[in-house]
Structure formats: C-alpha cells, structure tokens
Amino acid sequence: CNGQPKNENKNTVVFTDAIGREVNIKKNPERVAALLGSFADVWMLAGGKLCASAEDAWEDFGLELDDAVNIGGAHSPSLELLISADPDFVIASASTASNVEMRETLEAMGIAVAYFDVDSFDDYLKMLDICTDITERKDLYEQNGLAIKAQIDEIKAEYKNSDIPEDERKVLLLRAASSFVKAKGSSGTILGEMLHDMGCINIADSNTSLLENLSVEAIIREEPYHIFVVTMGSDTEAAKQSLENLIKENPALSTLDAVKNGRLHVMDKTLFNLKPNVRWAESYGILYDKLTKK
C-alpha cells in the first residue's frame, strides 16, 4: 500500500512509501520523472509536470508530454535516459523489479525516489493524496479523488441494496493474452480488487488450484454466474482468440449458464486492466451494469 504522509513542514512532505522507506520529498519539485504511465497520469492529475516518463504514458494514457524524455518500456526503462532528463524526484513502482533495482543508483546520485503500488481505487486515492501534498494542490485531491470516491460509494451502495442472491454474486475472472488464459483471484489485479470491493465471490479465492492450472472441471463444478475476461498485451484480438480457442477446445464450458445466457463479459483493457485513475467511477458504473444484468 502507499503510506499516508506522517508529517510535513513548510517545505517537505514525509511519508512511508510502498517498499517501507521513510522518504522526505521537497514540495513542488521542478523536474519529476514517472516510471509508469499510470503514475505519470496521477502526477498530472495532482497538478504536476513531467520531465520524463515510460512509453505507456504516451501509448496507453495518451498524455501530452511534448518535452518529456521517453525512457522506454514500463518493465525495462532506460536508467541512462532517465538520468539524462536530470530529474530531482522520481516516482517509481514497487511491483516492477527494474524500478526497485534503480533505487541504489538514484539514491547515490542524490535523486529523491518514492515507490508506490496501486491495485485498487483506495491505493490510487492514497497516492493522489500524497502527490497533492507535494504539489500543494489539495483542490485537485477533492476534484480527482474525493469526488470520484463519492460516486463509487453510491454505485456500491446501489449494488448492495439490490439484494443480489449469493449464487448470482459468484464470479470467475480470467486474464487473456495472445499465448494464454489464466484465472485470477481478488488481489493484485484492478478488476479482481473491484469485484471483491463490490461484494462478489471469486471462485479462484477458495480454489487456489485454479490459479495454477485452469481446471475446466472446477469451473463447471463451481458454476460461476458471471465470467469476466480482461485482455492484456498489445494484441487484443489475439487475446480474444485465445479465449475462443479455450472454449472450442473445452466444449463443456459452452454448457455454463454464464456462457449460454450472455454473462461472459470481455472488459475494456483501458478501464479494467490498466489503472483507470480519474475514470475509476466509470469503471465501477460499467461493472455495476454487468453484475445486475439478468
């Protein structure tokens, strides 16, 4: 998780980051680099500007960073290009090994670095809170954080009040790529966390063997009411083809009520695999519509 600010004086913000370090960040840093596109987006939503970011800031988030240095792919950013941008503050991912490996080099060079880990709306809200402390733009925390939370709370309350029976809250979450289809549990994925937050029962949480080996027999036995699929990778059509192949190769899957009755949902990658950030309420709204579909 992302620690809340512990204390701050007039010029700095002190907080515990996602890898357990106490960091002291100067307010309003002049040259900021984000090692993930989603974190670049959060920093800009907090009123900040960027001197460098990973490629997905442009490709997946469509951010306008004309003067910023493109440091390469999110999983393998170039340390050389990052340093060439002369950052005084680097926003890094605790769950990306290459980012964590850069820590010692950045610290040795006197470059402030803070690590974040965002898998849920609450994680996003905590990160935005810290970033708006650093930019001194708490108005943007209200606008891009608390206002979104109010919308999400309303959607969750509406779902809870609809008294969906337990068997209709049973879900299977699949992640499809061009070369595989895997079941995912509630933790560690955007859609998994959202389904859990809405009060759904993910069959992979109680049957962990599903996570290691996609057992068609277990899926048939559990009979999920909804099946949600998120695609990953750049080739969405190839990922969808992987899913189609799985169903063709395992005809028993076609006998599931969820498949027969239109409750197999292929979800938008932008809103349910990447981090939706300011669009999180939109994601919850779409999910609500799917979950209440008979």
Residue locations for each model-derived region?
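Structured C-terminal subdomain patch of bacterial secreted/periplasmic proteins
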Residues: L125-D133, D139-E142, V229-K294
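Extracytoplasmic ligand-binding site segments that recognize negatively charged/polar headgroups
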Residues: S98-E101, D117-I130, R169-I190
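Short helix-initiation/N-cap motifs at beta->coil->alpha
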Residues: D17-G20, A68-E80, N207-V216
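Alpha-helical, coiled-coil/dimerization segments enriched in small aliphatic residues
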Residues: A57-E59, K182-E212
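Bacterial Sec-exported substrate-binding components of ABC uptake systems
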Residues: C1-S38, K138-L174, T231, D289-K294
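Proline-aspartate-enriched helix->loop->beta-strand connector
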Residues: L79-A92, I111, V216-V229
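A short, structured surface patch at a secondary-structure boundary
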Residues: L35-A85, F89-T96
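A local structural motif
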Residues: V23-N28, G62-N70, M198-T208
